[in-house]
From Swiss-Prot:
Residues 1646-1668 are annotated as: Disordered. The gene is Heatr5a. HEAT repeats lie at residues 850-887, 1082-1119. This is HEAT repeat-containing protein 5A. The modification Phosphoserine is found at residue 1647. Belongs to the HEATR5 family. Keywords: Phosphoprotein, Repeat. InterPro entries: ARM-like, ARM-type_fold, Laa1/Sip1/HEATR5, Laa1/Sip1/HEATR5-like_HEAT. It holds the Pfam family Laa1_Sip1_HTR5. Gene3D superfamilies: Leucine-rich Repeat Variant (1.25.10.10).
Length: 2038
């Protein structure tokens, strides 16, 4: 193929190829040429133009296929536009000659067609350059058309369209000729020709004024004729033509009088009348022929009506939303008049009426629902409301008129009913779509919307009553706050008007519809409504027999209410189940004998009532089983079963009842049968086992009954066909935007579409996806559907013999019927058989050989049926039969049977049926073995090339695609030949056969999937395959059919998945963007599915290509939004107007992927998009309020720019719907989350501003804070409740992410501070009385987050938001009864708990701040101002909360008590309070539990803090209220009047203690994987707070089992949660438990001492763990549990501490390591706990644990003793030294019973520390300073007998000596500091050996430094520490030795002095040393004056030096204290001050 990539065709290469390859080669060359010509230099093209034209014309003569000729024509046109146009006329003449040729042979046809296409392309591209001779060309083409076949006519029409496009107004001379030709083609028998003619006329009307002026009526009539017998594509094309022409007629500015063309003005009324005439009378009506309009007797065919319906939509869409707003009244009036009494012909039969109503609803939905913004929709709803009122008044006047002559007849009532049905359905749809934004509409008293809808609930027509009920359903779904009031109103009217038949039917339907809406309203309805409804239903059923006029209505209404009640689910129904089952039992006779008696009584009417009642009962039970599965226990099933046999018996008697009482019972009997079948389908077959044979016979009779309708196929069969197979059938079976109206064309003209009045029970069922109003089919069709489904179940359950009998019966029925009747029976039987096979396969059963034979015979007959849908269903059954048989031989036999049929048959029916059967076999059995695969492919190859029948080709290719899919790797050997076949067909099949191209596309897709990743290969064969795939895609992309283009995109998507490098992303994205707004739903879906895949990997590239396409502007078809807002904005705009849910989901996912990949990089673009969407509708006063607030804040540079944006530019998003705005708000949150994982500067304004200055392209989120706040504000204050929730969510995210960011311009402040007013304004509306609870709950969360964030420090500002919480608290104090009764009780629970949770969060933060403030007061000294501000803020917040704390504490404890009850296991359910808890009712406990789970943790923490603050004693409380479970009556009131025993305060405290502890332990015990970090932390902090107070500590300390249990729970938490925060908090609780135990032990010891007297101390019992034996029992010991937990923490951080690991090979040589900060803190906390343990033990017990504690402490020291700069000690070393000191100073070390053992163990420990110096196996040497410090701690903290043992003491001295001789000055210095402490130790036995051994070394060290002078600060510090050490020695020396020491010290000090000269030039180090030495001398002189004088006298040199120094430093001498610098040095160098463990 590379040879094809040249400017001239490589003829040599192409001639060497076979026919198929040559066609491919030429096509590839033409594709390449198209791109090359546009990119090549004009001169180079002209140079080779002549040759190129010759080559192209030669190809023209070689019979090119359709895609090739199209590409050839384009290339020729581009060539002339780029090169010279000199020879263009010559080329045109050649084309004309080819067209004139008399050769009519089929082989010459492609050449003629190619010439036609070339002419069109040349004129389109070159336009007016060719204007001279175009008339000849047009005349020639039109002449050729007269003898052309359909393909020729098709191409000629498209060619004329191209000529008109190119020439524009210059083509005027030929306009009439073209118009005439196109007129005839518009009614052509070929649908493709009609489409082409419509396109041609659409182009013509741009310039031909007569089309939309003088000839407008004839154009309309022509279009109406074109609709007759049309297909979907024709209706789309022609309706576009008609709608556009009429829109032009209305809006066009007509030329003046001087114009040559006379033009007639056409008014809107005329245009609407014209369309109306077409709708009502088809093509027989004319604009001016009013007489003819009155005659129209014949019914208009449905396809004309559907076409006109689409034309209406195109007409209004072309004029646009703004036009519709202006002309709304006229338009609405006209559309509704189409089904009014002024046009009775349209609705003369029920079938016609239903179809017309559908069309009118579609027009209204597509225009009012699709084109208008929310404001205009509200106006439209008002207009509809007025129409309803007008009709209602007319109806009322007519019905109340006493004059019989003037009263409306029943036909008039029937006529007006259809207008009302359409109006009410559209009103419901509008409100449903508006959601809560429709609130102003319902509140507008002048409109009276609710009154008008409720008033028509009493309309005489059942259709209107049901439509009104459905409208109420829509209102309730849209505005949940209206649900309960509407329900109350309808129930009230039902109770009052129960003697009116219309009222009973109407209001029961309304109640049922409202109950159906409850599932869509998360807040629900009050639980008590169920009881009221059940009572009314019972009353209706019981009173039905009292009044025969109302019997039927009351019976229907009663059961409808019961059935609808079931949708409320088990929680409600469980309370009424007994009553329902009783009603069910009573409705059927108790025995067969009673049924027989019944038959002999009554009349037609009583039987009608009976059947309706029983059908209703069956429906109610079906509803119960569907919606209350949880209640379907074995016991309930047993109670349901008794009436079933009787119900089945009645089924068998129906035919005789019908004979007896007449045909009036026909419909009730059908409905009864349908209801019974539906119920039996839901029940397990075992439950009606005894009746199976009877049921089966009845079903067989039902399926073969003589009066069944023929049109059931379209209802029954699609569900039984595979969805993929439906694509090859009628396009009507595919999903389209027009499905709602196109559906009716599937049914025959004699069959009605679905409509609500056919089954009133469907009014409460869940909405069918994508449909607004339920559309149940007529009972006659529905019963067949149910019967065939039940047949599958029953036939699979009966025994084999019974099956054989029934199947033979069915087979005979088919044989004994003829014609259409036979088809109908066959259809029913096949659907039943399909259901049987489906059920058998699903239940893994099998069929016997005889049954298989019979099934095969039945299916084989259907496989050759003339009905395509039946053939399709039969092929599915064929494959399922093989699947069920699961027998290779049987399957092979089936395949062989099809092969034989295909080889012999020549008719289309057999060939299509059996080819699909082969494909289905492959699909279900994964291929039928390699031996059959080749035969199958061979047969399908042959069939797919049968050009005489496009149907055969389509089915065969579809079957081939199934074969490829299922064969998998086995197919690889056939890939090349199949691909060659596909490409050959793609290049040759005419474009008019779009269905063949679609099947080819599916084959190509299957091939690409089979090849998979192999397509990435680089070898020649793979490259050739890939090129062929791409070529195939290119052919399909260029096909005019949208569904073929969808296949092309799908193939390219697959190719991109497997070989992304080889797919041209630019052209693919271009193709996707162009088709983004295609009128074809399946194409839009393919586009979005592909885009979604692309952006997952290459979002930025896709976005860039889209922008390039928009800039290029060559493709006008690309969405205009692309130019303004890029692909992202175009997708958002598409999301706003798209109605298909799966497509919307794809759009959302695509945008999410793009946002994830690009939001951080394109921050401004994304935020602007979101802001534009949110601001486009923010036209409420609230928004202006933000702007004024912002203006007061002054200029803030970049941030504020958005707030002052002028709105002079038009919005790219006009009136976006609320759902789009919610999505935009969600995107804002996602953007913030994305930025969190990106650059730190996104949340640091100073850094962001600095980086922005550095590079202006940098963009950071923090710079857009004003935008974020504004967007959150706009959303939070919208009319839409969903958007308000999203806005509050966004605000919450903004507060949490930005609260801590400091304001660089105002230190001490944060950037969010300036938005206080905005936050307050956004929150305030959420606290009004009419706000739904979910919004208030979310607002409470935002309030608490705002207060807790610390943004606001000023109390007056804080009080504004605080006041909102106060108002909520006041509201909930009244308890659950007083809260809103609009919603379910669980909604009140949610609101109450949200308020309490918010207060809890605020209280927790207030206490925390107060605590921090108090600590700050202790530790720091701040300036007076900052102290004052901080204290006022910290204390002020606490004071604000404390005002309400008395109330809050009670509510918190009540909520916790509720939570504790709700979390009890199920076995305690019987013990729960029957009335529920404080904040929930027993009935709603299940749903309430979820709300408690969200809130309990913070409430628990707050309650624990409150109890801590009161010390468990509430000063305001008598101790009686909260000692027992809080009930609604006692929650906030005084003591109960029941006389219950008053508990003591002690009991109250105990209850509270156990409540807090119990909830905490229960939660921590069984932590679920989804338990949040916040909940666990809150729980642990609650325990910490609890244990901060003495009384709870005493409880824990005195109950050892409780302490152990709590420790075990904490141990589990530490094991299961890795979070350091959780582990630290757990350790803090452990520490508190140990402290509690210590306190308890101390108290017991003190008590014992006091009680027994001090004199008897020796005989005191031992307290503490271990008692006298020292034994610690695991599971019974608090200390042991603590040790386990601490070991767990330490070993996790330092695995080397594990004794097993330490003993393993290589385990000993470990390198000391530094832990991370979190790990260090954990280790320190564990060590601190270890230090406390000995105090909890008895002396013997302490001996037991001491080795472990010492091992762990010294282990930590050893493993973490890492050298740090400056001799610092690591955090863990410091902790281990502190622990060591705590242990060494423990009283147990001195206790008589343990002293000896402790001494021995401590000596061992010291020896272990000393051993640490000896590294094992080359491990790194540990830090000497750390180990020396540990040794020093031992020397100073233990009794002398531990450390004065010679062997230990000598080793210690050696270590110090070695350290003094270290080369590291820091080590020497630190050693001097440690020795300073030892030398001063008061006991000589300890200190003297060190002085004797080390003093001389120190003196030598100082003398050495004195000689060479210190060089740096470290040596200076060493020198100073050495001098201090000698000074200390002087101080402690005995008098007789002191002189010697002073004499030794003075020369050293004096040697450091500098004289006056040297002082000036001294370094800072020598100067500091001079000052230090001089200061020391000044102190020693007076203190030891005699020695001082003696030394001075004996050494004149020293004296002279001293004097010189003093003289040179007189200033220093005069100042008594040393310099500040020296002071600091002295302070810094003392380790005692740094760490306090010595």
């Amino acid at each position: 193929m590379e040879l094809a990539h040249s400017l001239l065709l490589n003829e040599e290469a192409s001639n060497q190829l076979g026919a198929v390859q040559k066609a491919e080669f030429i096509f590839e060359w033409l594709r390449y040429l198209e791109k090359l010509l546009l990119a090549t230099n004009r001169e180079d093209v002209r140079e080779k133009q002549k040759t190129l034209v010759g080559q192209l014309l030669s190809l023209l003569n070689s019979s090119p296929g359709p895609p090739t000729r199209k590409l050839l024509a384009q290339d020729l046109a581009i060539l002339y536009s780029v090169g010279d146009t000199v020879s263009v006329y010559e080329t045109i003449d050649k084309c004309n000659d080819l067209i004139r040729s008399k050769d009519d042979s089929p082989s010459y046809l492609p050449t003629k067609l190619a010439a036609v296409v070339c002419l069109g392309s040349l004129y389109k591209k070159l336009g007016r350059i060719l204007a001279n001779g175009f008339t000849d060309t047009v005349v020639n083409i039109l002449k050729a058309m007269k003898s052309a076949e359909s393909q020729g006519r098709y191409e000629i029409m498209l060619s004329l369209q191209s000529i008109l496009t190119g020439l524009g107004a210059a083509a005027a001379p030929c306009h009439r000729d073209v118009y005439k030709a196109a007129r005839s083609c518009l009614t052509d028998r070929s649908m493709a020709v009609r489409c082409a003619a419509a396109k041609c006329l659409l182009e013509l009307q741009n310039e031909a004024i007569f089309m939309w002026s003088t000839d407008v009526d004839s154009v309309a009539t022509l279009c109406f004729k074109s609709f007759e017998g049309s297909n979907y594509d024709v209706r789309i094309s022609v309706s576009k033509l008609l709608g556009t022409v009429l829109a032009k007629a209305v809006t066009a500015k007509h030329p003046g009088a001087g114009s040559k063309q006379s033009a007639r003005r056409v008014s809107l009324e005329e245009v609407l009348e014209l369309l109306g005439a077409g709708f009502l009378r088809g093509s027989s009506g004319f604009l001016r022929a009013s007489g003819d309009m009155l005659k129209g007797n014949s019914s208009v065919s449905r396809d004309v009506r559907v076409g006109v319906t689409q034309a209406y939509v195109v007409f209004v869409s072309t004029l646009g939303g703004a036009w519709l707003e202006k002309n709304l009244a006229a338009f609405l009036s006209h559309i509704l008049s189409l089904v009014s009494q002024s046009n009775p012909k349209a609705t003369q039969t029920q079938i016609d009426a239903v179809c017309c109503r559908r069309c009118v609803s579609f027009i209204l939905r597509a225009t009012l629902g699709g084109l208008l913004g929310e404001k205009a929709q509200i106006a439209a709803a008002k207009e509809i409301c007025q129409a309803v009122w007008r009709l209602k008044k007319v109806m009322d006047a007519a019905l109340s008129d006493g004059n019989v002559e003037t009263r409306l007849s029943s036909t008039d009532v029937a006529a007006s009913q259809h207008v009302l049905v359409c109006a009410l359905q559209e009103l419901g749809n509008l409100i449903h779509n508006l959601g809560t934004t429709a609130a102003p509409l319902l509140q507008d008293s002048s409109t009276g919307l609710l009154d008008s809808v409720i008033s028509v609930v009493l309309h005489p027509s059942i259709s209107v009553r049901l439509a009104a009920a459905w409208c109420l359903h829509c209102i309730a779904v849209a505005l949940p706050s209206y649900l309960t009031p509407l329900l109350d109103r309808c129930l009230e009217r039902l109770a009052i008007l129960k003697s009116s038949p219309e009222a009973v039917t109407g209001f029961s339907s309304a109640v049922a519809a409202l109950l159906g809406s409850v599932t869509h309203c998360p807040l629900g309805i009050p639980h008590g409504k169920g009881k009221i409804i059940m009572t009314i239903a019972e009353d209706l059923l019981c009173s039905a027999a009292q009044n025969s006029r109302l019997s039927l209505q009351r019976t229907q209404a009663g059961w409808l209410l019961v059935a609808a009640l079931m949708t409320l689910g088990p929680a409600v129904v469980s309370h009424h189940l007994t009553r329902v089952l009783l009603l069910w039992k009573c409705v059927f006779p108790a025995s067969p004998r009673d049924l027989e008696t019944e038959k002999s009584r009554g009349d037609s009417f009583t039987w009608q009532v009976t059947l309706e009642g029983r059908a209703g009962a069956l429906c109610a039970v079906k509803s119960f089983i569907s919606h209350c599965g949880d209640l379907l226990t074995e016991e309930v099933i047993q109670r349901l079963l008794p009436p079933l046999p009787c119900a089945v018996d009645l089924l068998t008697q129906l035919s005789s009842i019908l004979k007896t009482y007449g045909s009036s019972l026909k419909t009730p009997s059908i409905v009864y049968r349908q209801r019974l079948y539906e119920l039996l389908i839901l029940l397990p077959p075992e439950t009606y086992k005894g009746n199976l044979c009877v049921i089966l016979k009845e079903l067989a009779a039902e399926l073969t009954a003589p009066d069944t309708q023929a049109a059931a196929s379209t209802c029954l069969l699609p569900a039984l066909c595979h969805p993929d197979d439906l694509l090859i059938l009628s396009p009507l079976l595919q999903e389209t935007d027009h499905r709602f109206i196109e559906e009716q064309l599937l049914l025959g003209n004699g069959v009605a579409c679905g409509s609500l009045e056919y089954d009133p029970y469907s009014i409460y069922e869940k909405d069918v996806e994508g449909d607004s109003v339920p559309k149940p089919l007529p009972p006659a069709l529905s019963v067949i559907s149910s019967a065939s489904k039940l047949f599958g179940v029953v036939c699979a359950t009966v025994d084999e013999a019974q099956r054989v009998l029934i199947l033979e019966q069915l087979l005979n029925s088919i044989k004994h019927t003829k014609g259409a009747r036979q088809q109908t029976v066959q259809l029913h039987v096949v659907s039943a058989i399909s259901n049987l096979l489906k059920y058998v396969a699903g239940s893994k059963q099998s069929l016997g050989p005889e049954v298989r034979r019979l099934v095969l015979t039945l299916v084989l007959g259907a496989l050759e049926s003339p009905t395509p849908l039946l053939r399709c269903a039969a092929s599915e059954a064929w494959a399922r039969l093989a699947q069920v048989a699961d027998d290779g031989a049987f399957t092979a036999g089936l395949a062989q049977l099809s092969f034989d049929k295909l080889k012999s048959a020549r008719d289309v029916v057999t060939r299509t049926g059996h080819s699909l059967a082969l494909g289905s076999l492959h699909r279900y059995l994964g291929g039928i073995g390699p031996q059959h695969l080749s035969s199958c492919i061979g047969v399908l190859y042959t069939l797919s090339q049968d050009s005489t029948s496009p149907d055969v080709q389509t089915w065969a290719l579809h079957s081939l695609s199934l074969t490829i899919d299922s064969a998998g790797a086995l197919y690889h050997v056939h890939v090349e030949s199949t691909l060659s076949l596909i490409v050959m067909l793609l290049l040759n099949v005419p474009p008019t056969h779009a269905q063949v191209h679609q099947s080819l596309g599916r084959c190509l897709n299957a091939l690409i999937t089979t090849l998979g990743p192999e397509l990435q290969g680089s070898n020649t064969s793979v490259s050739a395959l890939r090129t062929s795939c791409l070529l195939g895609c290119a052919v399909m992309q260029d096909h005019p059919g949208c569904l073929v283009q969808a296949q092309a995109i799908s193939c390219l998507q697959q190719l991109h998945m497997f070989a992304p490098r080889h797919v041209n992303l630019s052209s693919l994205v271009s193709c996707l963007c162009v088709n983004l707004c295609s009128p074809y739903l399946l194409l839009r879906r393919a586009v979005l599915a592909c885009l979604r895949q692309l952006v997952q990997r290459e979002a930025a590239e896709v976005s860039e290509h889209a922008i390039m396409l928009a800039r290029d502007g060559r493709d006008a078809a690309a969405d205009a939004n692309l130019r303004e807002v890029g692909l992202e904005g175009a997708l958002l705009a598409l999301l706003d107007r798209e109605t298909d849910e799966s497509l919307c989901q794809d759009i959302r996912e695509t945008l999410h992927h793009m946002l994830t990949s690009m939001a951080v990089g394109k921050l401004t673009l994304w935020l602007k998009l979101c802001k534009d969407v949110l601001a486009a509708s923010a036209d409420f006063t609230a928004v202006t309020c933000v702007d004024t607030m912002q203006e007061e804040e002054g200029d803030r540079g970049d941030d504020a720019s958005v707030l002052t944006r002028g709105d002079d530019k038009p919005h790219p998003f006009s009136n976006p719907r609320w759902a789009t705005r919610v999505f935009a708000a969600d995107c804002v949150c996602r953007i913030i989350n994305q930025c969190e994982n990106a650059n730190r500067a996104h949340f640091d304004i100073a850094l962001a501003q600095e980086m922005k200055k550095r590079d202006s392209r940098n963009d950071f989120l923090v710079l857009h804070l004003a935008d974020l706040i504004r967007m959150a504000f706009m959303a939070a204050t919208d009319h839409s409740d969903q958007l308000r929730l999203s806005g509050l969510d966004t605000l919450l995210v903004v507060i949490r992410r930005f609260a801590d960011i400091a304001e660089p311009e105002f230190p001490g402040h944060v950037i969010l501070e300036q938005y206080q007013a905005n936050v307050g304004a956004a929150l305030r509306p959420a606290f009004t009385s009419e706000t739904p609870p979910d919004i208030t709950a979310k607002a409470c969360q935002v309030c608490s987050a705002w207060i807790a964030s610390g943004v606001v420090s000023d109390l007056s500002d804080l009080r504004r938001v605080h006041q909102l919480l106060v108002s909520s608290l006041t509201k909930i104090q009244a308890g659950k009864e007083a809260l809103s009764q609009l919603y379910n009780e669980s909604a009140s629970t949610m609101e109450i708990l949200a308020v309490l949770r918010a207060w809890a969060e605020v209280y927790i933060i207030a206490v925390q701040r107060h605590k921090n403030h108090k600590q700050a007061l202790k530790t720091t000294v701040n300036s007076e101002d900052s102290m004052r501000n901080g204290s006022s803020s910290a204390a002020g917040l606490l004071d604000l909360v404390c005002t309400d704390l008395a109330t809050l504490s009670k509510l918190w404890l009540a909520a916790l008590q509720d939570f504790a009850l709700l979390t009890l296991p199920a076995e305690f359910a019987s013990q729960l309070p029957t009335e529920g808890g404080a904040f929930y009712t027993a009935e709603t406990s299940k749903s309430a539990k979820l709300h408690y789970h969200d809130s309990w943790a913070l409430i628990l923490h707050a309650a624990a803090l409150w109890l801590t603050s009161t010390g468990f004693a509430d000063p305001d409380e008598g101790g009686a209220n909260l000692s027992r479970p809080v009930t609604p009556t006692s929650m906030c009131q005084g003591s109960s009047s029941s006389g219950a025993a008053v508990k003591s305060p002690e009991d109250v405290y105990t209850d509270r203690f156990h409540l807090i502890l119990g909830i905490s332990v229960e939660f921590l015990c069984s932590l679920r994987s989804d338990a949040s970090l916040e909940s666990i932390m809150a729980c642990l902090r609650a325990l910490q707070a609890l244990l901060d107070v003495p009384w709870p500590r005493w409880r824990i300390g005195s109950d050892q089992d409780l302490g152990i249990e709590l420790l075990n729970v904490l141990h589990r938490v530490i094991l299961t949660r890795e979070s350091p925060a959780i582990q630290l908090a757990s350790l803090e609780v452990v520490r508190q438990i140990i402290c509690a135990a210590q306190e308890h032990v101390k108290e017991k010891r003190r008590s014992a001492e006091v009680d027994d007297g001090a004199s008897e101390k020796e005989t005191l019992p031992e307290f503490g763990e271990g008692k006298d034996t020292g034994g610690l029992v695991p599971g019974k010991s608090l200390v042991f549990a603590t040790l386990e937990l601490c070991v767990c923490i330490l070993v996790r951080q330092l695995p080397e501490l594990n004794p097993k690991l330490a003993g393993s090979p290589g385990g000993k040589a470990s390198k000391p390591k530094t832990l991370l900060e979190e790990g260090s803190r954990l280790v320190a906390a564990a060590l601190a706990i270890l230090a406390e343990l000995p105090a909890v033990c008895s002396p013997e017990g302490s001996i037991s644990i001491l080795p472990t504690v010492l091992y762990l402490t010294i282990g930590v020291l050893r493993e973490t003793a890492v050298k740090l700069p400056g001799g610092q000690l690591s955090c863990t070393v410091t902790a281990s030294l502190q622990t060591l000191k705590g242990i060494l100073t423990s009283p147990m070390a001195r206790a008589e019973k343990s002293h000896e053992a402790w001494t021995s163990l401590l000596q061992s420990a010291l020896a272990t520390v000393l051993d640490c110096w000896s590294p094992v196996d080359g491990a790194q040497e540990p830090d000497e300073v750390s180990l020396l410090t540990a040794v020093t701690v031992f020397i100073l903290s233990t009794s002398p007998e531990v450390t004065t043992v010679p062997c230990l003491q000598n080793r210690c001295i050696e270590k110090f000596k070695a350290a003094l001789e270290s080369k590291d000055s820091v080590v020497q210095m630190k050693t001097c500091q440690l020795l300073h402490s030892i030398f001063q130790y008061p006991k000589p036995a300890v200190s003297y050996p060190y002085i004797y051994s080390l003093a001389s070394s120190i003196v030598e060290k100082l003398q050495d430094i004195a000689r060479r002078k210190p060089e740096d600060a470290t040596e200076l510090q060493l020198c100073q520490e050495g001098i201090k050490l000698l000074e200390a020695l002087v101080a402690i020396a005995e008098e007789e030795h002191r002189a010697q020491l002073v004499a030794c010290l003075l020369p050293i000090l004096i040697s450091f002095l500098l004289d006056e000269n040297a002082l000036g030039s001294a370094t800072s180090v020598t100067r500091s040393l001079h000052d230090f030495a001089l200061h020391s001398l000044m102190q020693i002189g007076p203190r030891y004056s005699s020695v001082f004088k003696r030394v001075m006298a004996s050494s004149p040199a020293l004296k002279a030096r001293l004097e010189a120094a003093v003289k040179g430093n007189q200033e220093s001498v005069r100042v008594d204290p040393p310099s500040k610098h020296a002071k600091n040095l002295a302070r810094n160098s003392s380790i005692q001050l740094k760490t306090n463990f010595l």
